Amino acid sequence: MEENPLQCTICKNEFEEPILLSCQHTTCRKCSTGSPSCKSCSPIPSTSRSHTPHPDKLAAFLLDASKEEMEECANCEQISLPMFYCETCQQSLCLVCRNVTHQARMFSSHKIISSDERSKVYSSSLCKDHNEPYILYCSDVRKLVCIQCFNGRPLEERHSFISIEQGHRLCLERIEQSAAKLRFYQSERQEELNVRQRVLDENASNFDDARASLYQLCQQIIDTVMTTRETLAKELVKQQEQSDEQCKRQIKEIEAVMGPVRLCLFSAQILCTTASKLDVLQLCPQLQKRIGVLLDKTIDKLPVSSTPDSIEVRSDLAKALEPFLGMSAAWCPISVSREGSSSNSYKRGSGSHKAISMLSKFQATIDLAGAFGELFGKVEHPLRQLVTALSSTSQQVLETQRDLTIRRCIIEKEDVEKLVKTCKKIEAGLGMHSAALDGMQSEMQEIWQEQLDRVRRQQIIYREKVEEILNLRETARQILTAAKQLVPYVSCILNMNAMIDPKRCHPPDPAPMESICLEITGIEPNSQNRILAIEKEEENRRLNQEAKKKEELAGQSAVMKTLKHGKIKRKEMNRMMLNTNRERSPGGTDTALTSPCIRRLTTALKEETASELDAEEFLDEIFELSGEQYDEVVDGTLTEEDRCSSALLLSMEISSDSISPLPSLEQLLGRIPLASRVTSNIGFSRGAMLQSLNDVFALQKPPTPENISVSEERNVLASAVRNAEKRKSGAGLPTNSDKDEVIEKEEIEKETEKEKKKVIRRRVKKVSEPSEEEVTTFTFNAPPDCPFVPQEIFESDEKLGTFEAKERVLQSLKQKMNQKTE
């Protein structure tokens, strides 16, 4: 009998202030006071006991709808069925008043419906926040909104607003879908409830039959099997209690779920039929949420029904009767699942095919050999046919039952009668087969007696072997005791030997290579351990080599630290470096030499070594000019070709660890190509060479205020130098008187220069013939340091190119070097 969904399950009365619990049950507020859990499903553990009960709006709405009274007619104030309702006038009308008041043409646009179709609004039609009437429905949050709520939403969220009519249709569709799922859920649970109820009844009848058969069997040998009977009866009762308890618990769970299911279905029916649109829109989310919670609930699977065969009655009784009747449990029917347990070793078989299926082919061949096999073959083949027919018929009966109960199909009567006839035929065949087996029992008894005699003989042999094994075990225990007594003597002797001769106690360790070979040979060819061992040895070998290299480098660095340092480095301010990052002209000349960009060499750029300083001192001594050689100098003015010819005076590459030799005669005379005479470090070698030559020439020919002009600027353009030389070329060559004056002043200046310890580098400009006219002087912009080139090397009427000028200068320097060495 189904309960009223609007009735409390505790007080059995109609709801008063209904509240919703976490288990989806609805009770009265006064019934749930002081109870932390639901009384209907208290045995079921609750997953959310901290859930605070809140009012059940669905139940309250159903209560209000069920108590709705018929309204009186607004015109005659009487109730006469049928009643109508004018939605335009918002008034109730009886049939007479409707015909009287709404017959005029002016009332033709009024919408009049039956009072049964009218849906009364029980909830508020105004917004709680703004006290404005609802005009739209938001499909995202599933709430009614007023004009203020609509204006307060941003523009990107206003796409979810729909009219109340559309929202009403949408909610009705959702309710119908959820209700359909809930109906299907209800049908499944109802079917499970019915199945478990039938299982409960079947278990009761089956266990009653088993108990009766057990008592009948035990009466024959009541004295010997009384204890066994009580034990088996307790096991039966225990299994029955477990099965009944599980079924009852599941039945209680399903019954507890059915109450909220009926309430939700009733709510869905009311909302879809008589509820107003606003009520549907407001209560639809709650109903769907509750339906979803109910659909998520699951019920445990149906417990496996146990039969009396699982208790293994015959096997236990055979074991109990074995001391009295001499019957062994091995003669009982073999079960399908034969395990090693003493109490569950054998089960009753339902046919010979199960016994044979548990045996191997070899065992079946041995057991079926001889006379027993011939007799067994007469009944085995017909029995297999009957088993196949029985299996097919049982499957057909099962499908027919499912068609009737689950699929709700219509079954033809002829089909059922055909199944009944088939079952009767199979039963008759089994009866005939059983009679044939009973007739064969006498013949098989003789065969079994012979086998029993053979078994007895085998048992005698077995007992002899058991006694022999027992004797051997006793002997083994005695030997073990003797061996244990020898252990302290052996350990004492070994300790004394270790004190006397320790080497004999510990065998020598194998060599490293031998241990590696033993380890590798003990590993499988393709094993991971062997690969790891090889990789480990390779890694150790590599680490040893790196350690040796580090030791060698450390020794070399220690030796280098013990060496003496060279001479004191000169100041970096006196070093020059030529910027060689210039493009060369198509004719082969270096444009950087015509107007070189000279810069000071800083410590960060290059550091002089002692060998470089020694090489410069050696060059200073070689290129030192005497006074007689200087007398031959005619003019000290510089031309464009002179400056260019001194650019590649000598090419000398000086490394940090060795000094390159001076250029050979073939290189100076131009017999070897120019490219072989120019080194990669041309900037440094040229600067060192020119610096030494300037020092020598400055000492031999000190400048005077009359014939020099000092240039403080660093750079000078080649075109400016060329124009200045052209302007001075008209003055002529210097006279011999000027030379004498220079020689006399030279000796005086040598002594003063030694005291000053400072070399003043000047560029001297001479005027061939003194005149009262002003001599035009040109201020150089810090020209690069170049050696003084005597004018007598070149003929006055000969115009030489840059390459020829370089060759003339190199030949002159070579001659001076030869004179110096002689």
Curated annotation (Swiss-Prot):
It comes from Caenorhabditis elegans. A zinc finger (RING-type) spans 8-42. This is Probable RING finger protein 207 homolog. InterPro entries: RNF207, Znf_B-box, Znf_RING, Znf_RING/FYVE/PHD. It holds the Pfam family zf-B_box. PANTHER family: RING FINGER PROTEIN 207 (PTHR22635:SF0). GO terms for cellular component: perinuclear region of cytoplasm. Residues 526-558, 738-769 form a coiled coil. A zinc finger (B box-type) spans 68-115, 122-164. Keywords: Coiled coil, Metal-binding, Repeat, Zinc, Zinc-finger. One of its GO terms (molecular function) is Hsp70 protein binding. Zn(2+) binds at C73, C76, C97, H102. The lineage of its organism: Eukaryota, Metazoa, Ecdysozoa, Nematoda, Chromadorea.
